Amino acid sequence: MEVVSQIDQENQAIIWKQIYGFSESLLLKCAVQCEIAETIHNHGTPMSILELAAKLPIDQPVNIDRLYRVMRYLVHQKLFNKEVISTLNGGTVQVTEKYWLAPPAKYLIRGSQQSMVPSVLGIIDEDMFAPWHILKDSLTGECNIFETALGKSISVYMSENPEMNQISNGAMAFDSGLVTSHLVNECKSVFGDEIKTLVDVGGGTGTALRAISKAFPNIKCTLFDLPHVIADSPEIPTITKVSGDMFKSIPSADAIFMKNILHDWNDDECIQILKRCKDVVSAGGKLIMVEMVLDEDSFHPYSKLRLTSDIDMMVNNGGKERTEKEWEKLFDAAGFASCKFTQMSVGFAAQSIIEVY
């Protein structure tokens, strides 16, 4: 039998890691569903496996061995820490393993402003995974993989599934909170004195626009999105809500704001949306976008996330992430004269601010 070299073993390990890559996502989902982070956080001190099993919000008795093995994996993934505590009991040293939150686990606690729980539950979902299983079919045409897998577009799916729509809105709200914190604190010049009116196209439940309105009270803000999204958005005194279809009409303003909208669409659809924006932006106004910008050489720390998001867009709605050159080509086709790219440095630093004139 041929001896496997060290290099072959290393290369095989790479393939095995890819084969079992799903385990990271699904064990993360399991941790969120079982509320492991909240349980330990609320307890206030490290917990033994028996203490954790007794406090988890699970109706049936917990299998201690299986919970231990799940926690062992999550510790390996650096989501939780394990502490070995020695105590003296009647002359005998007793050793107990206890679990505590590692720094990333704070994002797995429901209810906090930093919570990424909606993103975990929204992305790592059986229906959301279904299109990925037929990814091969996307290589032979222009079919919408999500529609092929689930029989309907993602927008129709969300409108028919209120719970998933709410989770999706929660995920977008988290992202919006990170992005707008950077926008209003570090990039105030983007919202210059010349901007008196602003429309957030595809603004979801208004998280981003609420922050913009608070930071710049002189700007009259309008939230614009599909009817089922607007219906799920809270009433905000300083913001006007308008429902509609951006392919048909967009309210006019000095500035149009769009966060993670165009990556949902193919090039022709993007050009249609951009032309609508150009038609309604006041003279001297601009389009303000927050989008990922792919780097050609993939050397950025967020390159893998950006590339993964690109495939996610292809799978779920036929969209894509784009390079600077690809963005510039779209802006030119829509009749815009110039643009400016600014890489975000805090918050969700995988994204960029794009100003289009």
UniProtKB/Swiss-Prot annotation:
Its EC number is 2.1.1.-. The keyword S-adenosyl-L-methionine applies. It is an enzyme of class 2 (transferase). One of its GO terms (biological process) is methylation. Gene3D superfamilies: Vaccinia Virus protein VP39, Winged helix-like DNA-binding domain superfamily/Winged helix DNA-binding domain. Optimum temperature is 35 degrees Celsius. GO terms for molecular function: O-methyltransferase activity; protein dimerization activity. Keywords: Alkaloid metabolism, Methyltransferase, S-adenosyl-L-methionine, Transferase. SUPFAM superfamilies: S-adenosyl-L-methionine-dependent methyltransferases (SSF53335), Winged helix' DNA-binding domain (SSF46785). The keyword Transcription regulation does not apply. PROSITE patterns: SAM_OMT_II. Involved in the biosynthesis of benzylisoquinoline alkaloids. Catalyzes specifically the methylation of norreticuline at position seven to produce norlaudanine. No activity with norcoclaurine, reticuline, norlaudanosoline, norisoorientaline, scoulerine, salutaridinol, oripavine, salsolinol, codeine or morphine. Involved in papaverine biosynthesis. This is Norreticuline-7-O-methyltransferase. It comes from Papaver somniferum (Opium poppy).
